[in-house]
Swiss-Prot record:
Matching NCBIfam families: AceTr_1 (NF038013)
SS bond list: none
Region listing for Disordered, in residue ranges: 1-43
Main location: membrane
Keywords attached to this entry: Cell membrane, Ion transport, Membrane, Transmembrane, Transmembrane helix, Transport, Vacuole
Protein name (record): Acetate permease A
UniProt similarity note: Belongs to the acetate uptake transporter (AceTr) (TC 2.A.96) family.
Chain's role: High affinity monocarboxylate transporter (MCT) involved in acetate uptake. Unlike other activities involved in acetate utilization, acpA is dispensable for growth on the acetate precursor ethanol.
Induction note: Expression is induced by ethanol and ethyl acetate and is mediated by the specific transcriptional activator of genes of the acetate utilization pathway facB. Expression is also induced by low concentrations of acetate or propionate and under the controle of the facB transcription activator.
Membrane topology: Multi-pass membrane protein
Amino acid sequence: MSAEQNHGLEKDVGGPAAPAAAAPNAPAAAPGAPPAGMSAEEHRSRFGYGPLSHVNTKEAILPPFGGEFQPGLYKSVEARKFANPAPLGLSAFALTTFVLSCINMGARDITHPNIVIALAFGYGGLVQLLAGMWEMAVGNTFGATALSSYGGFWIAFAIVLTPGGFNIQTALTAENGDEAMFYNSFGLFLMGWFIFTTIMLFCTLRSTVAFFLLFLFLDLAFLLLGVGYIQRDDAGQPNPPVIKAGGFFGLLAAFAAWYNALAGIADSSNSFFIIPVAHFPWSPTGRARREKTERETV
């Protein structure tokens, strides 16, 4: 076999050809470990595609991955005792956000978001909060902060909308006899979450496109919804076009969350394909790929 054919075979199968015979006393290489003289990051950038591209190996450092809710380089967690909690938290966030965003967009002429209360307490709230706590157990600070916070958001959202016991909306409308104070308060509530989401967004700038888009869409949704409640229409109601725009970006955020969740769940053991996540050119993986291209073109 010629050198050119051998090089093509290496690119197709995702690694260099094995040596004819190993030394009797040589230690066995870890599965997926880079060959001698090649860093783990360069190995992943050159051969990190195909059915095993998202399978965690025993590399010391892994690249950013939204399926693990990791915006930066992180240590391999192959030997952890916990399963990956990120897809659970992402799915809880996605479903609750999807339903509320459809209502905000006026789907099926639904005008009251009361159905979201059950989801916000049970799935988007409690389950996502638990996923955030489990992210603490696996050592993911970003995932723990984000998932726990958005779980708290949904619980707080459900408390605001719950009639009766909490009496929040009634107390805010009792003073002037209209809902202006409640709408202003709720708008400030949403703007606070816009600020928090912007902080989280900054932490995804070196991660993947799919992970970044999740927080970008969510950030725009909070901003537009907050503006819609503060800058109301002539009738004193939340501005319908702005609320619908916020619902649209919320819908995009929900699908982006499901996409990242699927990327974290699908692997060679349960799927015939792997979800692409597209690393930014300035991310660690993107830089390694660019350096490889520059070396090959010299």
